[in-house]
C-alpha cells in the first residue's frame, strides 16, 4: 500500500502566486451584443413569480447583503453551493469554510495563496510550530490611522490656530540693532555727566543741606500749648441757654378731671385686698389634731364616736356562705357605741402631768 505524504499540501507556498494565476485557464470574454430594437413593454409578472425569481437570482435574495460576494455567513448567495467541507485545508486560507472567489483573495492582493491555516475548530497557524490557540501576528507594520504624533499641533495660521514655531522668534533686522546702539550711547553719556557733577560738589555744600535741629525753651512751649487749648475751646459748641421771656406770654390751661384716676384707684385697692387675704390664710393657726392624724389614711379618734370598725379582707368561705367576711362587717358596725372606750384617749397638750416641762 502506497503511503500518502501529509505535507504534500504545503507545496503551494514555494511557488510564485503570479505563476499560479497564469497556470489557471483564462476567462473567455463574451462578444459585445449589438443594441436590439426596442420592444413593447411586457406585462409585469404576478407577485409570487417575482418572489421566486428574486430567490433564484444570483444576488441571493435576503442574504445578498450579508454574505454577498465572499459568502462568510450569508443566508443566500452564489457561494452557498461552493462550500467544500471535505476539500483540502489550504483552499483560500480557511480550513473548512466558504470560498471567497475563483482567483482567491491572495491572488488579488499579490500575496501568497494560503495564508492562515487551521482546523475546523477555528485554530490558526502561520506555517510555523506556534500554538494551536495563538493567533499569528500581522505581516505588516502597524501605523497610526490618524497620522498624528505626540507633538503639539502648531500648523497653520490665523486666529484659531497655534501658529508655527517660527512665529515665536522675531526676525532680527539692521534697523532694530541700530536703534539699540543709539540708546546705549545716550545712556552712557547721561551717566558720565551725573558722575562729574557729583565729583564737583564740595563737602561744605553737603553739610548745609542737612536740616537744622529746632530748639525751644519751656516758656515758648507753654505758649504753644495755650494757643492750642484756646483753639479747641472755640470749636466747642456753646451750651444752650433757655430764655424765660418767651414763656411769659403763655397762659395756663385748666385741666379737667377725668374718671380714669378713680378706676385706677379701685383696681389698686382690689389688688391690695387679695394680697392681704393670702397673707391671713397663711398666718391662721392650725389645730394640733390635724398633725395627730395617723398615716396612710387610717381612721383616727373622733369625739362623736363615728364608724370605727375598719374593713378587713374576705375570710375563707365556710359552708354555703357566699360572703365569708359578713360577720366581720357586722362586728365592726356594732362597735360604734363602744369604740371610744376601747381606744386610748388622745393626750392633752395642756396637761402638765402628761407633758412635764423641764426645770420643775
From Swiss-Prot:
Keyword Translocase: yes or no?
Answer: no
Give UniProt keywords alphabetically: Acetylation, Cytoplasm, Nucleus, Phosphoprotein, RNA-binding, Translation regulation
PANTHER family per UniProt? HYALURONIC ACID-BINDING PROTEIN 4, RGG REPEATS NUCLEAR RNA BINDING PROTEIN B
Q: Please provide, alphabetically and separated by semicolons, the GO molecular function terms listed in this UniProt record.
A: mRNA binding
Instruction: Write down which residues bear the modification named Phosphoserine.
Output: 258
Q: Name one GO cellular component term.
A: cytosol
Source organism superkingdom: Eukaryota
The name under which this protein is listed is RGG repeats nuclear RNA binding protein B
Q: Where in the cell is it found?
A: Nucleus; Cytoplasm, Perinuclear region
- N-acetylalanine occurs at 2
Q: Where is the composition biased (Polar residues)?
A: 162-176
The encoding gene is: RGGB
Q: Which organism is it from?
A: Arabidopsis thaliana (Mouse-ear cress)
Give the compositionally biased regions (Basic and acidic residues): 99-108, 132-157, 184-216, 258-283, 311-336
Bias regions of kind Gly residues — which residues?
A: 58-77
What the entry lists under Gene3D superfamilies is as follows: 6.10.140.1040
Start and end residues of each stretch annotated as Disordered: 1-216, 250-360
Entry similarity comment: Belongs to the SERBP1-HABP4 family.
